Amino acid sequence: MAHLTHPATRYHLIVAASAEDLARQTAEQVAAGIDLALAERDRAQIALAGGETPRAAYRHLGGEHLPWERVDVLLGDERWVPADDPSSNARMLRETLLAQTPASRARFHPVPTDRPTPEASAEAYAAELAALCPGPLPRFDVVLLGLGDDGHTASLFPGTAAPGVSDRSVTIGAGKGLPRITLTAPVLSAARRVIFLVSGAGKNQALARLLDPAEPAMRTPARLVRPAGEVVILADAAAAADLPDA
């Protein structure tokens, strides 16, 4: 699988006025990407971030009046835990986005964490992705990503093997004591629209490194996500403090 990155990727930093504004703008950006995709194709495929930061955005997004029955919802990464585990990203999506009307009509494709090993789960997820997005490289219409204070995104953690994987669409990640299943950098980079959601003062230095063209990508793996188009970064004031506009 070719790693289709683009050195000329541009970052567009948008600083929200409040937590509510950050959630609203994130929902609007994702909804706009879905709208654009459905104007051109029968179905839209989106890959969403897990964790706590996007919860409010998903509640906003779930109320957007879109033809959700034509939307496939996937995850950028998942912890290898049971689907009802409190740390499950799938559970979080079911409790937020997919609990809303009309988004409950979307077709959700969780990572199959019920397989006997993380590797088996990754293989099953890759097979589902290949069936859903046929072609040499799966291409999502929208990818929403978070940013860790260590510079990771999805489960591409610095100092692990996952950021360097470029020969498959899904791989095993390791971070914070749990095995994880994650989309790889080539798949994230192939997306038609890439959005980062960054919140909190603890993310300030990681965001500065993401925006620094001299920063080594393997030290800040979020820099491996290099689509052909613009990357939108939605941040709150704490995360964006003292940063130049990108």
Task: Please annotate each region the language model reported.
Residues L48-T53, L145-D149, S199:
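Glycine-rich beta-strand-to-loop/alpha-helix junction loops that act as flexible
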Residues A2-R10, E69-L144:
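Ligand-binding beta-strand-loop-alpha-helix segment within the catalytic cores
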Residues L188-A246:
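C-terminal functional extensions of proteins
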Residues M1-I46:
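N-terminal glycine-/serine-/threonine-rich phosphate-binding loop
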Residues A120-A122, A154-G159, A206-L210, D245:
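A short secondary-structure junction signal
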Residues D35-E64:
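Glycine-rich N-terminal segment of FAD-binding domains in flavoprotein oxidoreductases
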Residues H60-W68, R91, P158-S166, P213:
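A glycine- and small-aliphatic-rich helix-loop capping segment at beta-alpha/alpha-beta transitions
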Residues V142-P186:
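Class I SAM-dependent methyltransferase SAM-binding "motif I" and its flanking Rossmann-like core
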